[in-house]
């Protein structure tokens, strides 16, 4: 794990007060993004919005559910918010990326005859 990712993990646990499981999920996602970017000669700190969108498309093609995609996007938002707060970046490449709408089922209605 890189020093930057370790700092982000500490931020999630102490400042953002995320649970260990949530922090672990976010860290795994950021490490996967880091590996993806490395293939293109980029780092987490010089990734563009286009890079993030390409990564998300690649991840969604593996058949992930909307809730998983929402968690992935939330991890990107948290990471780049951390980078802004720490003055590691001057911009947030994830700011225009929206979380997918969640499927909402109507509640079951109780039948008075049953």
Each language-model region and where it sits:
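N-terminal core-binding DNA-recognition domain of tyrosine recombinases/integrases
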Residues: 5-21, 27-106
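N-terminal positioning helix adjacent to the helix-turn-helix/winged-helix DNA-binding module
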Residues: 1-4, 114
């Amino acid at each position: 794990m890189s020093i930057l990712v370790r700092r982000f993990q500490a931020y999630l646990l102490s400042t953002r007060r995320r649970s260990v499981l949530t922090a672990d999920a976010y860290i795994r996602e950021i490490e996967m993004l880091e590996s993806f970017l490395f293939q293109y000669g980029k780092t987490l700190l010089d990734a563009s919005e286009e890079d993030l969108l390409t990564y998300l498309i690649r991840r969604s093609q593996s058949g992930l559910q909307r809730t998983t995609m929402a968690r992935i996007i939330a991890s990107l938002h948290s990471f780049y918010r951390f980078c802004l707060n720490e003055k590691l970046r001057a911009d947030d490449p994830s700011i225009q990326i929206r979380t997918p709408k969640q499927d909402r089922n109507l509640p079951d209605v109780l039948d008075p005859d049953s």
